[in-house]
C-alpha cells in the first residue's frame, strides 16, 4: 500500500463528511460552513492539470474548491465524475465534490445521478442519495432510460424546495447534457427542444459546444416527440432494404474506397462488399455535382412522394433479397474508408445512430418525426433563445442582473426567459436557498453568461450553416436507371410507396459534421420496410435477428459484470418482479441503506400501466417497462400498429394477451396472428371500408363508432385537480358553444353558453381523451369507452371514410340504410341524396368565399371542421326524420332492452346522446345565423332541443338509434 504524501489528508470522504459541520451560530446571509476548504500544495498542482483537462467546460469555485461544474438551473447541476486514485489528479476529486455539494446545499439535500456505466462508488459519500444508469460512452442514450431518469429527478425535486440534483458521467458534458436536456423537456422548461439544447450548451461550455454530436441531439428530439405524443418507448421491428450514399468522399489514392456496416446495438448485422471508385471515375463523379439542393429542407416523407425519387444520383449497398436483414430499436450505420495504412486506425468517415420506432409513423401512433435542427433554423440575426430585434409574442425577457453588483447591466441582446423556470423554482425560493447562506442564486450568473456569449457571437447555427442553397437540381447528370442490386452505382433511385426512407445529410452525421473535407451535399439514405406479419417465414427470420442482437448485448453486459468489483455486483431480482425490475443486470440501480445499490425506485412510481401486459415479463422486452406515476399521461404503444405506407397492420409477436393454465404468457404460431389480422381486414372489406388505421378488436360499420374493451394497462386513473396540467387545444380545432357541462369548471352546470373542445358534437378526438380534463367532465366520461389514441383514430378514420364515400356517390347509401336498418323507401332515399347534393353545393359556395385560401392551406382543418361537422349534422337529421316514421319500428331500442342485453344501465349512453344533440343543435344555430346562404332553414331541419332536466326516458329511447 502506497503511503500518501504528508500534505495529503489520508482520511476518507465519509469521515470528512462526518467532520463537516454547519456553523451552529450562523446568521442569515452567512455560509453554512465558516471555514473555507484548505488546499494542500499537491491539490494546487493537481488543479493545473484539472483545468487543462476540463478545457472549454465551465468551472465553478466556492470556498477554495474549484470544480469542473456548472449550474444549469438553480436546482440542476452538471458536474464531472468524482474520481479517486490516479484519475483524481486530472478530474474532480471525490473529496472536493462531496465538500462542494455539502457546503453549498447542506446534508441530505442532493441526489446524485451517475451516468458513467460500470463505475460505482460508496453511496454514503453522498448521503446515500445516488442512482446509477448504465450508459455507454460514445453511444447515444438509451431511450428507455430517459423517462425513469426524469421521473426520479422530478420526484426528488418536488419532495422539498431545497432539494437539488447533481448529474455526472465521465466529463459531465455529453451523456450528462443529454439527460439534463431530457429533464428540461420533461418539465417544459422551454417550448422547443432546440431552445433547451442551446441553453444547456451555452451554460455548460465556454465555446457553446455542449451536446454537439448529431445522434445525441437526435435522441433528445426523439424524447421530445415521445413526450409530445404521450408515449413510452417500445422498439419497432423493421426490414432493412439498403443503404445509399450520395457524393461519396475522396479517399486515399484520389478515388473513393468506402465500406458500410449496419449494426443493431453492438451487433453487426449487415457488412456488404466495399464500394471502389477509381480516381478517374471519381473525378467524373465530382464534375456532376452542383452546389444546390433540389428539395426544400433536404428530404422528408412528403418530398419523397412529390419528387418520386429517393435520390437522383447515389451509390447503393443493397441487402440481397434471399438474405433479408431485420433491425429493431437502436441502429448504427458506419461509413469507413479503406486504403493504405487504414488497418492501423478505424478509418471512420462518419456514422449515424437512429431508432426504428421513429422510422414509421405507425410507431408513433400517427406522429411524424423530423430533425429539429433542420425544421427550426435561426431566423435573421436571432438565435433560438436570443433576440436582437425585440421579443416575439408570448415571450418575456430574462432579467439583466449583474451577479457581482446586483445592478442591471446593459446588453443589445434580450434572452428569452424560460417559461417553466418559475414553476421549477420561484425567485423567492432561490433567494432563500442561496442568499440566505451568503451565495448568489445561479440564475443571475446564468443570465450574465447567456448575454455575454451572444454578444461575443459564439452562438451559431453550425448545423444549418452546412445546408446547400436551393436550386433546380443537384446534379448535371442523373444516375443510371435499371435493376438496383448489390454494391455499385451511380443509380437513379426511385421512391417506392411501401418503403420508409431516412435521410441523413452531412450535418446529421456524427464525425462527418466536423469534417471540412466532405462535400456539404453528401447524404446517407437508409431504406426500411415494415415487416409484413402475414409472411410467416419473414416473421421467423426477423425473430432470429432480434434474438441474436439481444443475446450478444446480454453477453456483453454479463461479461462486464464478471469484471466488476464483487462489492458492487447486483443481487438477483426478486421473485415475481415485472418490467425493468427483472432485467439482469439492471440498467438502473438505486442506492440502499448499506451504501450499495440494491434499493428501489420512488414509492410514488407504480407498475399499473404494464401490470397485466405479458410482454413486460419477457427477458427481451422487460427492460423497456419502468414504473411511472398513476397520473402519468404516457402510455405504451398497443400490440397492433398500422403502417400508413403499406396500409397494413403489424404487431409485436411477443405482446400476447393469452396465458396458459399456469398464468404464464402463451404465444401462438405466426400463422395464428396472421389469421387474426386477416379476419380484421376481411371484416373491414365486407363493410366497404378502406383499411385506414389501427384496430384492436375488429371493425365498426361505416360511419359508426365501435366501443372496445381496453386492457388493464390502458385504463386511466383520474388525476386530482392539483396534478392536472393546463388543457391543450389544437390549432386546427375551433371552439363551439354548447349548453350543459362547463369543461373548464366541471363542478358548475348551467344552461349558459359554455365552450367544449369538440367539432360539431363529434367526440372521438384526441384532445377530448386527454387526462388533463377533470374526471367529471364529458371528456373523461367519453374516455371510459375510448381508452387509447389508436381507438380514437380508427373511429375518426371510419367516420371520414363513410363521408368520403357518400360524397363520391360510391353506392354507400344502400350500405348505410342496411346498416342502420332504414326501410328502402324512395322518399327517404331521395332525402339523403338531396342532403348530399346540398352539401356539395355548400362546398362550391365555400370555394368561392374569401376564406377559401385559408381553409385550403390547412387540409386537416377542412376535414375536421367541415367534412365531419356537416356529415354528423346530416346524420342527426336522418335520425330525427326516421324517428318520426312509423315504417321503421326496428330502428329503435328501448332502455329496458339494452339493460336486458348488456346488464348495464344506459346512463353513459344517455350522456353521449345528450352531448351529441346539444352540440349539433348549437352548431346549426350558429352556422344558420352567421352564414344563412349555406344553411337555409327549409333544407336543414331543426333538431329538438334537449336539456338534462327534460331528457326523459321516453325521448331518450327515441334518440337511441342503431
From Swiss-Prot:
One of its GO terms (molecular function) is lipid binding. Changing residue 137 to A: Probable loss of phosphatase activity. Stabilizes the interaction with vab-1. Expressed in embryo, larvae and in adult germline (at protein level). Expressed at equal levels in the 6 vulva precursor cells (VPCs) of L2 larvae and in the descendant cells of the induced VPCs (at protein level). Expressed in the uterus (at protein level). Expressed in the Z2/Z3 germline precursors, oocytes, several amphid neurons and weakly in the nerve cord (at protein level). Its EC number is 3.1.3.16, 3.1.3.48, 3.1.3.67. It comes from the Eukaryota. It is a peripheral membrane protein. The keyword Cell inner membrane does not apply. Changing residue 174 to E: Probable loss of lipid phosphatase activity without affecting protein phosphatase activity. Fails to prevent both constitutive dauer formation and increased lifespan in a daf-2 (e1370) mutant background. Disruption phenotype: Mutants are viable but with a shorter lifespan. They also fail to enter dauer stage under starvation conditions and 17 percent of mutants display vulval bursting. Unlike in wild-type animals, germline stem cell proliferation continues following sperm depletion and Z2/Z3 germline precursors continue to proliferate during L1 diapause. The number of unfertilized eggs laid after sperm depletion is also increased. Prevents constitutive dauer entry and pharynx remodeling and restores normal brood size in a daf-2 mutant background. InterPro entries: Dual-spec_lipid-protein_phosph, Prot-tyrosine_phosphatase-like, PTP_PTEN, Tensin_C2-dom, Tensin_phosphatase, Tyr_Pase_AS, Tyr_Pase_cat, Tyr_Pase_dom. The keyword Lipid metabolism applies. Residues 234-530 form the C2 tensin-type domain. Interacts (via C-terminus) with vab-1 (via kinase domain); the interaction is independent of vab-1 kinase activity. Interacts with arr-1 and mpz-1; the interaction may inhibit daf-18. Interacts (via C-terminus) with daf-2 (via kinase domain). PANTHER family: PHOSPHATASE WITH HOMOLOGY TO TENSIN (PTHR12305), PHOSPHATIDYLINOSITOL 3,4,5-TRISPHOSPHATE 3-PHOSPHATASE AND DUAL-SPECIFICITY PROTEIN PHOSPHATASE PTEN (PTHR12305:SF81). This is Phosphatidylinositol 3,4,5-trisphosphate 3-phosphatase and dual-specificity protein phosphatase daf-18.
Amino acid at each position: 500500500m502506497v503511503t500518501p504524501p504528508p500534505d495529503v489528508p489520508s482520511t476518507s470522504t465519509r469521515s470528512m463528511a462526518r467532520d463537516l459541520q454547519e456553523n451552529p451560530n450562523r446568521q442569515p446571509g452567512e455560509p453554512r460552513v465558516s471555514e473555507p476548504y484548505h488546499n494542500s500544495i499537491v491539490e494546487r498542482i493537481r488543479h493545473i492539470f484539472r483545468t487543462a483537462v476540463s478545457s472549454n467546460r465551465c468551472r465553478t469555485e466556492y470556498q477554495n474548491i474549484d470544480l469542473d461544474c456548472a449550474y444549469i438551473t438553480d436546482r440542476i447541476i452538471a458536474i464531472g465524475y468524482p474520481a479517486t486514485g490516479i484519475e483524481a489528479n486530472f478530474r474532480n476529486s471525490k473529496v472536493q465534490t462531496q465538500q462542494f455539494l455539502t457546503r453549498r446545499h447542506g446534508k441530505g439535500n442532493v441526489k446524485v445521478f451517475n451516468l458513467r456505466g460500470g463505475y460505482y462508488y460508496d453511496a454514503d459519500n453522498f448521503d446515500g442519495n445516488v442512482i446509477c444508469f448504465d450508459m455507454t460512452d460514445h453511444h447515444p442514450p438509451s431511450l428507455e432510460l430517459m423517462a425513469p431518469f426524469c421521473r426520479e429527478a422530478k420526484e426528488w425535486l418536488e419532495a422539498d424546495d431545497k432539494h437539488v440534483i447533481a448529474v455526472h458521467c465521465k466529463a459531465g458534458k455529453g451523456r450528462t447534457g443529454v439527460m439534463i436536456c431530457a429533464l428540461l423537456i420533461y418539465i417544459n422548461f422551454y417550448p422547443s427542444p432546440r431552445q433547451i439544447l442551446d441553453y444547456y450548451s451555452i451554460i455548460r461550455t465556454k465555446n457553446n459546444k455542449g451536446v454537439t454530436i448529431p445522434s445525441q441531439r437526435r435522441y433528445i428530439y426523439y424524447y421530445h416527440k415521445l413526450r409530445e405524443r404521450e408515449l413510452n418507448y417500445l422498439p419497432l421491428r423493421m426490414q432493412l432494404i439498403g443503404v445509399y450514399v450520395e457524393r461519396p468522399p475522396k479517399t486515399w489514392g484520389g478515388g473513393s474506397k468506402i465500406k458500410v456496416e449496419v449494426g443493431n446495438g453492438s451487433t453487426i448485422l449487415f457488412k456488404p462488399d466495399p464500394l471502389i471508385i477509381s480516381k478517374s471515375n471519381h473525378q467524373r463523379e465530382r464534375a456532376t455535382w452542383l452546389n444546390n439542393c433540389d428539395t426544400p429542407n433536404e428530404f422528408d416523407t412528403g418530398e419523397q412522394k412529390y419528387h418520386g425519387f429517393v435520390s437522383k444520383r447515389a451509390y447503393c449497398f443493397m441487402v440481397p433479397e434471399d438474405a433479408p436483414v431485420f433491425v429493431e430499436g437502436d441502429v448504427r450505420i458506419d461509413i469507413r474508408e479503406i486504403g493504405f495504412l487504414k488497418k492501423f486506425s478505424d478509418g471512420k468517415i462518419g456514422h449515424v445512430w437512429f431508432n426504428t420506432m421513429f422510422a414509421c409513423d405507425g410507431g408513433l401512433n400517427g406522429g411524424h418525426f423530423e430533425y429539429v435542427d433542420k425544421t427550426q433554423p435561426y431566423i435573421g440575426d436571432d438565435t433560438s433563445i436570443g433576440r436582437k430585434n425585440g421579443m416575439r409574442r408570448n415571450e418575456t425577457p430574462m432579467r439583466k442582473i449583474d451577479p457581482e453588483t446586483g445592478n442591471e447591466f446593459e446588453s443589445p441582446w434580450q434572452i428569452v426567459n424560460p417559461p417553466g423556470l418559475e414553476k421549477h423554482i420561484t425567485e423567492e425560493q432561490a433567494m432563500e436557498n442561496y442568499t440566505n447562506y451568503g451565495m448568489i442564486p445561479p440564475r443571475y450568473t446564468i443570465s450574465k453568461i447567456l448575454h455575454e456569449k451572444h454578444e461575443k457571437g459564439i452562438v451559431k447555427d453550425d448545423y444549418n450553416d452546412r445546408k446547400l442553397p436551393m436550386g433546380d437540381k443537384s446534379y448535371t447528370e442523373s444516375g443510371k436507371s435499371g435493376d438496383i442490386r448489390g454494391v455499385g452505382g451511380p443509380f437513379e433511385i426511385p421512391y417506392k410507396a411501401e418503403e420508409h426512407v431516412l435521410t441523413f445529410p452531412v450535418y446529421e452525421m456524427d464525425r462527418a459534421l466536423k469534417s471540412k473535407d466532405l462535400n456539404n451535399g453528401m447524404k446517407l439514405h437508409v431504406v426500411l420496410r415494415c415487416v409484413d406479419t402475414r409472411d410467416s417465414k419473414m416473421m421467423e427470420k426477423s425473430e432470429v435477428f432480434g434474438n441474436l442482437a439481444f443475446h450478444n448485448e446480454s453477453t456483453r453486459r454479463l461479461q462486464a459484470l464478471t469484471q466488476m468489483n464483487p462489492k458492487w455486483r447486483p443481487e438477483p431480482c426478486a421473485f415475481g418482479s415485472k418490467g425493468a425490475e427483472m432485467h439482469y443486470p439492471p440498467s438502473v440501480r438505486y442506492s440502499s441503506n448499506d451504501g450499495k445499490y440494491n434499493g428501489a425506485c420512488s414509492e410514488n412510481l407504480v407498475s399499473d400501466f404494464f401490470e397485466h401486459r405479458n410482454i413486460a415479463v419477457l427477458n427481451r422486452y422487460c427492460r423497456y417497462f419502468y414504473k411511472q406515476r398513476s397520473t402519468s399521461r404516457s402510455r405504451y404503444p398497443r400490440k397492433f400498429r398500422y403502417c400508413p405506407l403499406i396500409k397494413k397492420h403489424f404487431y409485436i409477436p411477443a405482446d400476447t394477451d393469452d396465458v396458459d393454465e399456469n398464468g404464464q404468457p402463451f404465444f401462438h404460431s405466426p400463422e395464428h396472428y396472421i389469421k387474426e389480422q386477416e379476419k380484421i381486414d376481411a371484416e373491414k372489406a365486407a363493410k366497404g371500408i378502406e383499411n385506414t388505421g389501427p384496430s384492436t378488436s375488429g371493425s365498426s360499420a361505416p360511419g359508426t363508432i365501435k366501443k372496445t374493451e381496453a386492457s388493464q394497462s390502458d385504463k386511466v386513473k383520474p388525476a386530482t385537480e392539483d396534478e392536472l396540467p393546463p388543457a391543450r387545444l389544437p390549432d386546427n380545432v375551433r371552439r363551439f358553444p354548447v349548453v350543459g357541462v362547463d369543461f373548464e369548471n366541471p363542478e358548475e352546470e348551467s344552461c349558459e353558453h359554455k365552450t367544449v373542445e369538440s367539432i360539431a358534437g363529434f367526440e372521438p378526438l384526441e384532445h377530448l381523451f386527454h387526462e388533463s380534463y377533470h374526471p367529471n367532465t364529458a371528456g373523461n366520461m367519453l374516455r371510459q369507452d375510448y381508452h387509447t389514441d389508436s381507438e380514437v383514430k380508427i373511429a375518426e378514420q371510419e367516420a371520414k371514410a363513410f363521408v368520403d364515400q357518400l360524397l363520391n356517390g360510391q353506392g354507400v347509401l344502400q350500405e348505410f340504410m342496411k346498416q342502420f336498418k332504414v326501410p328502402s323507401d324512395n322518399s327517404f332515399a331521395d332525402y339523403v341524396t338531396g342532403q348530399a347534393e346540398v352539401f356539395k353545393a355548400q362546398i362550391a359556395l365555400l370555394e368561392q368565399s374569401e376564406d377559401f385560401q385559408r381553409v385550403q392551406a390547412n387540409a386537416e382543418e377542412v376535414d375536421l371542421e367541415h367534412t365531419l361537422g356537416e356529415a354528423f349534422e346530416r346524420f342527426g337529421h336522418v335520425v330525427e326524420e326516421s324517428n318520426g316514421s312509423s315504417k321503421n319500428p326496428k330502428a329503435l331500442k328501448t332502455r329496458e332492452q339494452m339493460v336486458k342485453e348488456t346488464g348495464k344501465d344506459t346512463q353513459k349512453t344517455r350522456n353521449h346522446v345528450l352531448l351529441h344533440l346539444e352540440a349539433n343543435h348549437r352548431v346549426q344555430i350558429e352556422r344558420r345565423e352567421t352564414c344563412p346562404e349555406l344553411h337555409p332553414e327549409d333544407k336543414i331541419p331543426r333538431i329538438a332541443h334537449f336539456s338534462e332536466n327534460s331528457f326523459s326516458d321516453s325521448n331518450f329511447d327515441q334518440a337511441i338509434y342503431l
